[in-house]
C-alpha cells in the first residue's frame, strides 16, 4: 500500500474440483457473490484465524447455472461522491448481476459488463482499480459447423451424413455449401427477409438447420469479434445484440457452445480468387485454423474434420 507505506495484499481464490465442488478462500476482498437459480445465494463460510488475519473458507457443491462473482474493492467503491455517497454497495452490485445473468451472457461478458458499469460510476476516471472475475457453471453443449463443399463431389453425402448425425445445433456457412445441405435434406434454401443493414451478407433458412449464413466474409467477421472477446471485449454489445449472420454465429459459439465440431470442405470457390477482395480468401483453411485457435483460448473443445 503506497499510502500507508506497508506491504499489503488481498486475495480471492475460487478452486473448482472435478466440476462438482467450488472451494473458496477469501481475505479482505469484497465477499464473493453467488447466484443460484438467478438469485443471491448465501453459501456457508468458515472463519479461519491465521497470524491474526481473518480468512474465510467455503466449500460449495455445484449446480448447473451457479454463478460466482469475485471482485476487488474498487467495484463497491465505484461512484463515491459522484453517483453515490457511499459507493456502489455489494447488495446493489448483486441486484445488477441478478438482472443481467438470466440473459445467458458468457462469464467473460458478465465480468466486462460489471467493470464497464463501475467505470461509468467513476465518471470514466476510476479512483481505484476495479477487477472482476465471473465463473458460470453450465452443462456441455455441442455445436456443429459446416463450411465449404468437399474437394471430391462424391463425398457430399458422406460429409452431410456425418454432419447432420451429430448431436447439437447445426450451422451451415456458404452459398454452395447451403445448396448441398438443402439437397441432402430434401429442402430448399430461402433467403431470410429479417436482417439488418450490415456489411455482413444476409442469412438464409433451411428447414432442419439452426443457422445458415454466407461463408468467408461472415467467418472473417466472427474471427474479428473472437479476437476482441479474448482481449478488451469492447465489441460484445455488437455481436450480443446484432441480427446479422456473424453476430448470430458468435452468440452460438461464444455463449452456448462448449464442444465445437468443424466440417470443412477443401473445394476451391473461384469467386474467392479475386485479387481485388480486401481479404485474402484463397486459403479457407487459414480462417478455420484461426477461428479454432481463438475458440480454444475461450476454453472450447474443438474438432476439425476435412473433406
Walk through the language-model features, giving the residues of each.
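A short acidic-Thr-Gly-centered motif at the start of a beta-strand
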Residues: 12-17, 58-63, 159-165
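Extended, low-complexity intrinsically disordered regions enriched in serine/proline/glycine/threonine
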Residues: 174-175
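Active-site-proximal, acidic helix/loop segment immediately C-terminal to a metal-coordinating Asp/Glu
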Residues: 62, 67-117, 270-277
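Beta-strand-turn-beta hairpins that frame and shape the catalytic cleft
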Residues: 18-21, 63-65, 227-229
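Non-transmembrane, aqueous-exposed alpha-helical and coiled segments at domain scale
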Residues: 108, 112, 139-169, 178, ...
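Acidic loop->beta-strand submotif enriched in PP2C/PPM serine/threonine phosphatases
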Residues: 7-11, 42-81
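Catalytic core of PPM/PP2C metal-dependent serine/threonine phosphatase domains
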Residues: 1-38, 55, 108-135
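PP2C/PPM family metal-dependent serine/threonine protein phosphatase catalytic domain
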Residues: 2, 30-59, 213-218, 224, ...
Amino acid at each position: 500500500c503506497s499510502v500507508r507505506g506497508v506491504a499489503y495484499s488481498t486475495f480471492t481464490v475460487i478452486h473448482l474440483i472435478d466440476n462438482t465442488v467450488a472451494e473458496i478462500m477469501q481475505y479482505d476482498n469484497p465477499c464473493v457473490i453467488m447466484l443460484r437459480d438467478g438469485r443471491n445465494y448465501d453459501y456457508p463460510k468458515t472463519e479461519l484465524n491465521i497470524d491474526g488475519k481473518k480468512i474465510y473458507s467455503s466449500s460449495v457443491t455445484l449446480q448447473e447455472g451457479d454463478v460466482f462473482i469475485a471482485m476487488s474493492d474498487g467495484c463497491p467503491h465505484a461512484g463515491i461522491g459522484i453517483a453515490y455517497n457511499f459507493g456502489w454497495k455489494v447488495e446493489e452490485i448483486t441486484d445488477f448481476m441478478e438482472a443481467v445473468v438470466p440473459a445467458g451472457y458468457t462469464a467473460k461478458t458478465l465480468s466486462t459488463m460489471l467493470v464497464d458499469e463501475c467505470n461509468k460510476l467513476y465518471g470514466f476516471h476510476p479512483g481505484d482499480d476495479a477487477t472482476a472475475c465471473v465463473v458460470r457453471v453450465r452443462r456441455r453443449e455441442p455445436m456443429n459447423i459446416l463450411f465449404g463443399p468437399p474437394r471430391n463431389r462424391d463425398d457430399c453425402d458422406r460429409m452431410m451424413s456425418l454432419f447432420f448425425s451429430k448431436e447439437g445445433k447445426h450451422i451451415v456457412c456458404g452459398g454452395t455449401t447451403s445448396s448441398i445441405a438443402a439437397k441432402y435434406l430434401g429442402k430448399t434454401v430461402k433467403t431470410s427477409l429479417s436482417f439488418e443493414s450490415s456489411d455482413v451478407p444476409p442469412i438464409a433458412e433451411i428447414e432442419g438447420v439452426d443457422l445458415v449464413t454466407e461463408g468467408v466474409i461472415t467467418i472473417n467477421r466472427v474471427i474479428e469479434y473472437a479476437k476482441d472477446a479474448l482481449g478488451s471485449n469492447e465489441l460484445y454489445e455488437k455481436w450480443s445484440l446484432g441480427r446479422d449472420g456473424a453476430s448470430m454465429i458468435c452468440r452460438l459459439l461464444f455463449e452456448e457452445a462448449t464442444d465445437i465440431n468443424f466440417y470443412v470442405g477443401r473445394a476451391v470457390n473461384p469467386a474467392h480468387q479475386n485479387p481485388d477482395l480486401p481479404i485474402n480468401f484463397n486459403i479457407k483453411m487459414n480462417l478455420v485454423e484461426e477461428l479454432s485457435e481463438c475458440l480454444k483460448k475461450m476454453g472450447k473443445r474443438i474438432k476439425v474434420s476435412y473433406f
